[in-house]
Amino acid sequence: TINVEGTDKAHSYDMPFSAVHVIVPKERTEEALIAARDAGARGVTIMEAHGMGLSEMDNFYNRLHASATDSNLMFITKTKNVDNIIKSVLTKLDITGEGQGLTFAYPVSHIKGLRLKIDDI
């Protein structure tokens, strides 16, 4: 069910949606948010994260208690926006190697509670 902003209407629409995740060091969170917004993202859920490479798995227990060093930004967006959002973040943050950031997307269904502007439908 999609809520239409500015009205009391909620409808079921047959629209493909995806989740785009952008995981970046905390200090680059604002840059990533701006890049995604400029590419069409309209809302975000921000989660604290802490990544580790396979070489760090030997001391896995101690890493469980490490403080978060990254932000996991999750954008629910129309599938047609996915490529633009990912390209914008990768380009503007110059994410090219290990430890600099990560992006991925996957399709989602059965969305409830999402609010869209009438122009976005």
What residues fall within each predicted segment?
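Positively charged, small/polar-rich N-terminal and surface patches that mediate targeting and assembly
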Residues: 1-121
